[in-house]
Amino acid sequence: MKKTLLLIDGSNFIFRAYHAVPPLTTSDGRPTNAIRGFLSMLRVLMKDVPTEYVACVVDPKGKTFRSDIYPEYKANRPPMPEELAVQIPVIFEGVKKEGIPFLQVPGIEADDTIGTLAKRATAEGFTVVIATGDKDYAQLVNEDVILINTMGKDNTWMNTEGVIQKFGVPPDRIIDYLALMGDKIDNVPGVPKCGEKTAVKWINEYGSMDGVIENADKIKGKIGENLRNSLEFLPTARALVTIKTDADLSEEVPTFETLRLREPNREELMDYYNKLEFRTWARELKKSSAAGEVKSLDF
């Protein structure tokens, strides 16, 4: 039976948790809504994907190679709200105290770390499950890599056929699909006014973005003009939306045993819950400790 590696897009989870959970504070005024939401999402996920091999991956501080390619990459993002910023290190602390391997690799974005680990793991016989709400990861899906789309109310599993149903193109055309549309969140320009339907139509008609470029003169109207005006930048857009699968992670993950779940230190975890006033979880942990269970999140 194949082993499963669960790769969690922690950066995506953090922002989703912050915006999904109403303001929540401790009795002395410390914000905890993102912390509570994030750890709650992990609880659901770990029940949905029972496995011994996990990594929670987050973006590093500072710029990466994409900023060298295009200095305006992510330059449009507003500053992180202070109410969230103060919760980030506490979230990281909680992940580690729960016994979940945590990765924040300097100079390498979370998606490139995840892409690289997915490729390495499948080569070693793992099935890989990527938990995210970010559509960019659809480019990694294949017979051994599955997405859990966490954007809906219930986690939705997405294989190759699921990608085609959702986006209208197969996983190996997601990069072209993204490049043609651009990405407003990451400040990656695409073809102006080219939305999902147009990108799918062009790719299905011409086979790929290269095919679209080769046939740009055949596309009529304002959208055709927009396409022709974008031809010079499209290869750069494609490079920006392509997830790397060859990052050097030899130091962080020498073997996949590095990513095996660890038994949490119950005293430290109890102290963490109590400081944050997560009383229900503290009671659950105390009860499970009395019963001799080994995992706090029902892993």
Q: What is each of the regions a protein language model found here?
A:
Residues 10-12, 60-65, 80-89:
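Short, compositionally biased "basic patch" segments
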Residues 67-72:
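Glycine-rich loop at the start of a catalytic domain that most often binds anionic cofactors/ligands
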Residues 2, 24-25, 75-250:
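Extended two-metal-dependent nuclease catalytic cores across DNA- and RNA-processing enzymes
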Residues 33, 37, 197, 207, ...:
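Generic recognition of stable, solvent-exposed alpha-helical segments in well-folded globular domains
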Residues 1-2, 229, 239-299:
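Low-complexity, acidic/Ser/Thr- and charged residue-rich accessory regions of DNA metabolism proteins
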Residues 1-54, 59, 66:
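Non-catalytic, usually N-terminal nucleic-acid engagement modules in DNA/RNA processing proteins
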Residues 14, 34, 46, 87-96, ...:
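Basic, polar low-complexity surface loops/patches
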